[in-house]
């Protein structure tokens, strides 16, 4: 699959990262210009890390499934040294080089990408799901297992039934949604990446839940694959 070269990865400082984020955030579109029934392939993306000596390495895994049957269509992965230091709010700059390399290995072109992480639910609205969207030129969704507290705002827990949700509102703006995908099970944190609205994100996530996990199967399978690959590589 081809990607769009939005920017290089020579930047290494917080100030440079902020400039890039500020230029991209203006291009976020939280609307869906597609119909859910037109989705054929959906991809889950996850990364895992390990340290060897004084160096840190990462592996990115992408699992492509048939949106309607759940059948695994394709798997791809890539790994390498992580050269960008961790800085809160700028995680995408560490992860994107590996994500892009892995996407380029795909023989199939997914209609939707779902990331194990955040999108619009981010200090600068530029979580990995949002930042990656500009390179992928595809709708993206962020699905997080834990809550990223922005501006000191806590989330409100939804009711205990399956499908219950509460929007995450910060400074009168909806950043994402707390979604309970299974009765009496911890919720997940869903946010738009780009080129999609929150209602559609919720429908897609809910459709892709099975008996094995509270996570959509795309994200769950990608998570399992990254742990497997990390064990093999580290």
UniProtKB/Swiss-Prot annotation:
Cofactor(s), by name: Mg(2+)
Record has Nucleotide-binding as a keyword: no
One Pfam entry name: Endonuclease_5
GO biological process, one term: DNA repair
UniProt main location, coarse: cytoplasm
Domain of life: Bacteria
Residues involved in Mg(2+) binding: 46, 116
InterPro entries: Endonuclease-V
Enzyme category, top tier: hydrolase
GO CC annotations, alphabetized: cytoplasm
Molecular function via GO: deoxyribonuclease V activity; magnesium ion binding; RNA endonuclease activity, producing 5'-phosphomonoesters; single-stranded RNA binding
Site residues, Interaction with target DNA: 86
Localization per Swiss-Prot or TrEMBL: Cytoplasm
Function according to Swiss-Prot or TrEMBL: DNA repair enzyme involved in the repair of deaminated bases. Selectively cleaves double-stranded DNA at the second phosphodiester bond 3' to a deoxyinosine leaving behind the intact lesion on the nicked DNA.
Designated name of the protein: Endonuclease V
Organism for this UniProt entry: Clostridium acetobutylicum (strain ATCC 824 / DSM 792 / JCM 1419 / IAM 19013 / LMG 5710 / NBRC 13948 / NRRL B-527 / VKM B-1787 / 2291 / W)
């Amino acid at each position: 699959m081809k990607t769009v070269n939005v920017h290089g990865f020579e930047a290494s400082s917080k100030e440079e990262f902020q400039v890039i984020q500020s230029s991209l955030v203006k291009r976020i579109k939280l609307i869906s210009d597609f119909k859910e029934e037109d989705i054929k392939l959906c991809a889950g993306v996850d990364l895992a890390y390990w340290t060897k000596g004084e160096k840190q390495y990462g592996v990115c895994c992408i699992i492509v499934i048939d949106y309607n049957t759940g059948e695994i269509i394709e798997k791809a992965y890539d790994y390498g040294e992580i050269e960008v230091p961790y800085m809160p709010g700028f995680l995408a700059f560490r992860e994107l080089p590996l994500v892009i390399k892995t996407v380029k290995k795909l023989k199939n072109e997914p209609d939707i990408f779902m990331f194990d992480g955040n999108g619009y639910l981010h200090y600068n609205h530029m979580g990995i799901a949002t930042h990656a969207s500009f390179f992928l030129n595809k709708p993206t969704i962020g699905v997080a297992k834990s809550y990223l507290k922005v501006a000191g705002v806590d989330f409100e827990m939804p009711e205990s039934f399956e499908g219950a949700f509460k929007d995450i509102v910060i400074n009168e703006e909806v950043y994402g949604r707390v979604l309970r995908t299974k009765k009496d099970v911890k919720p997940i944190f869903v946010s738009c990446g780009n080129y999609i609205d929150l209602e559609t994100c919720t429908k897609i996530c809910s459709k892709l839940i099975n008996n094995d996990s509270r996570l959509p199967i795309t994200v769950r399978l990608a998570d399992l694959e990254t742990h497997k690959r990390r064990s093999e590589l580290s």
